[in-house]
Amino acid sequence: MAGKGEGPAIGIDLGTTYSCVGVWQHDRVEIIANDQGNRTTPSYVAFTDSERLIGDAAKNQVAMNPVNTVFDAKRLIGRRFSDASVQSDRQLWPFTIISGTAEKPMIVVEYKGEEKQFAAEEISSMVLIKMREIAEAFLGTTVKNAVVTVPAYFNDSQRQATKDAGVIAGLNVLRIINEPTAAAIAYGLDKKATSVGEKNVLIFDLGGGTFDVSLLTIEEGIFEVKATAGDTHLGGEDFDNRMVNHFVQEFKRKNKQDITGQPRALRRLRTACERAKRTLSSTAQTTIEIDSLYGGADFYSPITRARFEEMNMDLFRKCMEPVEKCLRDAKMDKSTVHEIVLVGGSTRIPKVQQLLQDFFNGKELCKSINPDEAVAYGAAVQAAILSGEGNEKVQDLLLLDVTPLSLGLETAGGVMTTLIQRNTTIPTKKEQVFSTYSDNQPGVLIQVFEGERARTKDNNLLGKFELSGIPPAPRGVPQITVCFDIDANGILNVSAEDKTTGKKNKITITNDKGRLSKEDIEKMVQEAEKYKSEDEEHKKKVEAKNALENYAYNMRNTIRDEKIGEKLPAADKKKVEDSIEEAIQWLDGNQLGEADEFEDKMKELESVCNPIIAKMYQGGAGGEAGGPGASGMDEDEAPPASGGAGPKIEEVD
């Protein structure tokens, strides 16, 4: 990398339900599989009485531990506790959310027997750490730099909070880019060789939790976002919920029992529903089977694709509204759309594809990129460009992103005066001159809002600051220049200057919205380090325990082998057997011991067994296998069998 020596830069798709990571390598993007072999990793973090789990391990144990397994952090990030969406989500989540300082939603869990509170940024940072580790394991080097994606619909505070999550995870976030833009890059590279002239591309991204539609034009490597629309709260989980509710009612009918207050039963049902939904994308019917779902009653129920579609028809239809809005905003007719690109796992649902295709009068949909991986793919390309790693294939791609919402300030009477219209290409800068509203007014309050409504009270206040010390003058005389400046990450700086005195004041739109302060972030970075070392301690402990267990059982099998057993003097054999038995007993009683305890026990056991085994080899084995005895053994291998002729012992795990 151009002189920075920080290893390759990665692209991370930080999703509501699943995340994905990619890297530019050998002139192409590699989507990296995790330790379970999956190319997407659940955005789940679980806390137990002994450890912290992230990804598949967390999702797999969720039925046993629903209250301490956190997911959907992306639905909380950068929001206030009182937001309507946070309040409605709270009803559905098994974990507890409370209001922290400045109305910041905090997630409450029990970890190692203590109550802990986490901000959404911290949970997201844990998922980011996991994604970074997946990349590091694949690349064999440390990774510092990353491009992270967010929905096009994310507002300023949600973007800032996502960037903060990256900082807590110890990443240098090169840039935050919009998911549809990332998908378009993936698609654009895919098609680059063949296309000439301007292409209008509609990205239809229906993921686990959010829904985004974007219209872009791609011309000679320049991507320009023309319009975006969507629903921050529509996705695969909503389709699962419909199915869950349907089966809850059915269970009630059949068994006269209501499982709505039973997190574990609900979780098992939800997992089965998610699986059924995926199956129904490729088959017309499937069956939900759950043994003793609740109160000893088994649950067994068929579901057809038609029934699933009917349950969700209103939601599927709702997916078409943002498509129309996007075309209207871009002032484009649907006949002028060249390509429709599907992104997000939920676009595999045949009905969604059919409705979309019908809307575009039967036009073929582009399915050449894997919908789960497109966003991470594009992010990886962007990371390669920003870190100067990519080859000429990518270096001439240029990304022009847009602001999703109009930005402006409040003028007399609560009117929203817009300086930057939504769908303006960023980075951008806009100045306008304002004045005072009353005679001899000593200062002005600059209040910055985002939104499309005419009155500021209907829009979202981003932040405010005071410009004081204006010399007394009649109203309308002082000249105050206000400048709005948006950088490439979509982060806004607002400044105001009094022309006569040259007095200036400015604000970077950050902390007014429950954003983390620098101290908070530093504290969280330290905590993240602490959790990481705890995780490593735990791993060491488990490895030491397993090594001891393997050694004990292998040794036991070795001396039970007749060919070897008969070569041992009875006293030695008994000595070995007793010490193994003692070690196994000790293990059963000390499953939660510390690593060094297991290591000490191992040394103790080896000091008894190894000399006896070595003596036996020197004495009875004849020839080549003498010498070092079993102490050089790998922890997983059984001691070698008798010297030259005898058969080798199979490893028993």
Swiss-Prot record:
PROSITE patterns: HSP70_1, HSP70_2, HSP70_3. Keywords: ATP-binding, Chaperone, Cytoplasm, Nucleotide-binding, Nucleus, Stress response, Transcription, Transcription regulation. The keyword Transcription applies. Induction: Induced by heat shock and cold. Up-regulated by viral infection. Induced by infection with the bacterial pathogen Pseudomonas syringae. Induced by cytokinin. GO terms for cellular component: cytosol; Golgi apparatus; nucleus; plant-type cell wall; plasma membrane. Expressed in cotyledons, leaves, stems, vascular bundles, roots, stigmas and anthers. SUPFAM superfamilies: Actin-like ATPase domain, Heat shock protein 70kD (HSP70), C-terminal subdomain, Heat shock protein 70kD (HSP70), peptide-binding domain. Residues 617-653 are annotated as: Disordered. In cooperation with other chaperones, Hsp70s are key components that facilitate folding of de novo synthesized proteins, assist translocation of precursor proteins into organelles, and are responsible for degradation of damaged protein under stress conditions. This is Heat shock 70 kDa protein 2. It comes from Arabidopsis thaliana.
